[in-house]
């Protein structure tokens, strides 16, 4: 996909601001101009091929783009007749390098939110930005929309029309149809009208859907008054609170990428799940909360890091009232589906928004998680974890297992409960069930070596702490050796009892 930015005009309505520079170089904040904002967003969203049409003070645009040092492939097409033509002619000048491609088409004076551009890029079909909530302008673009399809675009349409901006995502087929009509207009001398005049002739031949940005920022800077309004809106956007939550022990490139995307939406607050919250639904954390918190505090652009004590977002959303909550789209299905629903309902109460980014199913991330899980299964890690859980939760839940398969049931079983997720904390290896599985009426008839094989089978496929039912413990003289063997295998606890006679199954 390629982006086409129209920057040939003078922007004379801006007065002294554009007397010495093109309008696209107008500063809209301390750190960015209109053009730098557009290019940075395109770069963040993976669009590296850019075509910029120039005209008025063209060299200033070229020199400025070089100072940005962005990893972009920018081509410049100059419209020498910029003073006597409209942007339809600039597109005609660029026709040979912009045809036969999917494109993002925008005017060079457009300022928009990151989420507006992102949403349009992610759509499968061609689309144009409209707003069903904005007031119809008197002199600017409006789009006539029928059944979600743009039928007419211009300044004189009012019936069945919505406020519109010249920001398009166009698939190759639709764009080629429009570009062909643009070329026909220019060949016939129609070079002072809008390119949308040509579009209006062929809307029955292409399908351009309306993308409703509603109240999100997407506006042209035509006057100094427009500039003042947009600066205020950008200040509000940059100070919006964006909330994310993490449970990871290791930060990889996928986490950094999603944080950087979230930073485009406002100030990022990271919620770090407490050790207890993670242990309640996932593997036990390798790093304690305090270290994971510091880890996120040292990521550039993270505004604040707070603790999230439960898997449910309810308490933190109600406390901090973020404007936007960001999460991967993997929770739309599965065990966290109910938590997602709760987040949506709470945000609706005060007008908050949920933004979901595509989850990264990269093989290297999956391999990293498997490596961490394997470390948890190591005897030293497994053995010490029961004590940590008891210190953390005071009470743990265990379920009996007597084979690799039943061990997997204990390991994987999770249930949603009141906005959270519950799972078993430990595996109980029962002497009664172990002997029954081996067809023996009493555990005293089962050799300890045989029981050790059961533990090996379970350890091979699980990571949770193991509590071993040692029955009587056998001979007192042998018990110390039994305990040492169990410790080497990673067993966290052995329970013995005093009994007389056989306990028949």
Q: Model features per residue range: what roles?
A:
Residues 62, 66-141, 145:
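Conserved beta-loop-beta/alpha segment of the NTase-like Rossmann-fold superfamily
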Residues 376-417:
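N-terminal amphipathic alpha-helix/helix-capping segment at the start of soluble metabolic enzymes
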């Amino acid at each position: 996909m390629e982006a086409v930015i129209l920057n040939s005009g003078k922007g004379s309505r801006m007065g002294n601001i554009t007397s010495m520079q093109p309008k696209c170089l107008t500063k809209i904040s301390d750190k960015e101009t209109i053009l730098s904002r557009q290019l940075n967003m395109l770069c963040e969203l993976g669009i590296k091929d850019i075509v910029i049409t120039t005209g008025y003070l063209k060299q200033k645009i070229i020199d400025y783009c070089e100072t940005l040092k962005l990893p972009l492939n920018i081509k410049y097409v100059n419209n020498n007749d910029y003073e006597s033509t409209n942007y339809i002619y600039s597109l005609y000048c660029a026709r040979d390098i912009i045809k036969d491609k999917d494109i993002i088409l925008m005017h060079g004076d457009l300022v928009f939110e990151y989420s507006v551009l992102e949403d349009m890029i992610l759509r499968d079909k061609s689309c144009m930005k409209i707003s069903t909530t904005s007031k119809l302008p008197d002199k600017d673009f409006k789009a006539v929309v029928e059944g979600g399809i743009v039928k007419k675009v211009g300044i004189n349409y009012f019936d069945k029309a919505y406020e519109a901006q010249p920001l398009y995502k166009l698939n190759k087929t639709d764009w080629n149809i429009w570009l062909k009509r643009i070329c026909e207009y220019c060949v016939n001398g129609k070079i002072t009208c809008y390119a949308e005049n040509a579009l209006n002739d062929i809307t029955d031949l292409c399908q351009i859907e309306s993308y409703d940005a509603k109240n999100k920022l997407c506006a042209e800077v035509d006057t100094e008054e427009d500039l003042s309004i947009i600066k205020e809106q950008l200040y509000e956007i940059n100070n919006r609170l964006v909330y994310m939550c993490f449970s990871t022990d290791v930060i990889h490139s996928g986490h950094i990428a999603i944080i950087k995307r979230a930073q485009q939406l406002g100030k990022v607050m990271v919620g770090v799940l407490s050790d207890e919250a993670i242990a309640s639904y996932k593997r036990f954390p390798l790093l304690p909360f305090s270290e994971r918190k510091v880890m996120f505090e040292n990521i550039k652009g993270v505004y604040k890091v707070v603790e999230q004590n439960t898997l449910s977002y309810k308490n933190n959303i109600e406390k901090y009232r973020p404007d936007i909550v960001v999460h991967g789209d993997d929770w739309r299905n599965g065990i966290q589906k109910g938590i997602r629903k709760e987040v949506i309902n709470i945000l609706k109460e005060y007008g908050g928004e949920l933004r979901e980014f595509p989850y990264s199913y990269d093989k290297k991330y999956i391999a990293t998680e498997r490596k961490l899980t394997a470390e948890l299964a190591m005897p030293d890690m497994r053995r010490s974890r029961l004590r940590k859980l008891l210190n953390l939760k005071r009470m743990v839940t265990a379920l009996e297992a007597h084979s690799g398969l039943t061990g997997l049931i204990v390991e994987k079983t999770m249930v949603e409960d009141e906005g959270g997720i519950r799972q078993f904390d430990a595996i109980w290896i029962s002497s009664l069930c172990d002997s029954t599985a081996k067809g023996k009426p009493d555990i005293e008839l089962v050799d300890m070596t045989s029981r050790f094989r059961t533990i090996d089978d379970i350890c091979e496929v699980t990571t949770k702490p193991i509590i071993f039912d040692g029955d009587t413990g056998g001979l007192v003289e042998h018990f110390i050796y039994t305990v040492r063997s169990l410790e080497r295998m990673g067993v966290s606890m052995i329970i013995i009892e005093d009994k007389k006679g056989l306990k028949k199954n």
